[in-house]
Amino acid sequence: MKKILGIESSCDDTAISIITESRKILSNIIIPQNTEHAVFGGVVPEIAARSHLSNLDQALENVLTKSNTELTEISAIAATSGPGLIGGVIVGSMFARSLSSALNKPFIAINHLEGHALTVRLTDNISYPYLLLLASGGHCQFVAVLGLGKYKILGSTIDDAIGETFDKVAKMLNLSFPGGPEIEKRAKLGNPHKYKFPKPIINSGNCNMSFSGLKTAVRNLIMSLKEVNDSVINDIAASFQFTIGAILSSKMLNAIRLYQQILNYYYENVDYTTNLNLKSFRQDEFNLNHLQDITRPKSRIYLQNSFRSNLLNDTIVIAGGVAANKYLQEILSNCTQTYGYRLIAPPMHLCTDNAAMIAYAGLERYNNKLFSPLNFCPKAKWSLEDI
């Protein structure tokens, strides 16, 4: 039985996991660093890298013990090799390559974002293709997931990432780190319509997003208030979260339209299995403001008849740390259901950074014999389109 060991160290969680070829998670160890970074209100890269260096040996021992596995039983070692905080990425990647060399087992460099993108294939066995909203501390983008290593970014944030925005607003409100769960908790107690915040570029007609103006609006409101008590904090958190939900819902509709248009274009003009030329696609070839409304039922019947039915997937996936937010899951699920799609998110413990997703991405690459050289250079920036 094949067993893949995955290592994740791109931010502030040291994680190692072992999964089997049948997608069973034998062990999924995470050593968090929240206490080390809480005093700073955010992740300090140097502290994170040093903590990874201290934690990896213990994490490996724990994962082997819990899974009742010997190192010699491991078939391949997969490790996050970008994007992320480069110090931590280097530490984890070097650790993995050392194991690979010592055990004479294949090394597989994994793009952290691909790990998030494929998590639902580990948990729900979703087939390709599907539309993905990747929302995390460092990224926010809509992605057409057309196959392993075949990704097209339909739109992304042009400034701050969504998770980063949650953390910064939480810090403004003197909430603890990490800020996302604290905002969600406080929002349940507040009035989402108390304060009206801007929704930057919401009417731009594309899938791009902007959160810096929203963050600034929250800061300006806080500075203008004479008193910021618990009730005010709850209302600000609720209004902020409501605004985020409205932005994502609006952009989701644009993404659905563009995604289906891409499928229709490529699967009628390109041999999907051998020659999917994503590099040739330019978003400006498709004017969203003049597209047929393919989200309507009659149009979806047309789509089902216009290209191979096995390629029509009614699943939309939300992944990344922000996907753990139950409010946003509900809002986006209601939005997608209106247009005939179902929204799926990984279990909460697999939304945030973990090594099981890295091990699974490694399994898919292992099965396709997509191995990496031991001199693979870790990357601080690494787009899904450049894998």
Swiss-Prot record:
Its EC number is 2.3.1.234. Transmembrane segments: none annotated. One of its GO terms (cellular component) is cytoplasm. GO terms for molecular function: iron ion binding; N(6)-L-threonylcarbamoyladenine synthase activity. It catalyses: L-threonylcarbamoyladenylate + adenosine(37) in tRNA = N(6)-L-threonylcarbamoyladenosine(37) in tRNA + AMP + H(+). The keyword Transferase applies. Binds 1 Fe(2+) ion per subunit. Its cofactor is Fe(2+). Fe cation binds at H112, H116, D353. Substrate binds at L134, A135, S136, G137, G138, D167, G180, N325. Required for the formation of a threonylcarbamoyl group on adenosine at position 37 (t(6)A37) in tRNAs that read codons beginning with adenine. Is involved in the transfer of the threonylcarbamoyl moiety of threonylcarbamoyl-AMP (TC-AMP) to the N6 group of A37, together with TsaE and TsaB. TsaD likely plays a direct catalytic role in this reaction. NCBIfam families: gcp_kae1, RPE3, T6A_TsaD_YgjD. Belongs to the KAE1 / TsaD family. This is tRNA N6-adenosine threonylcarbamoyltransferase. The gene is tsaD.
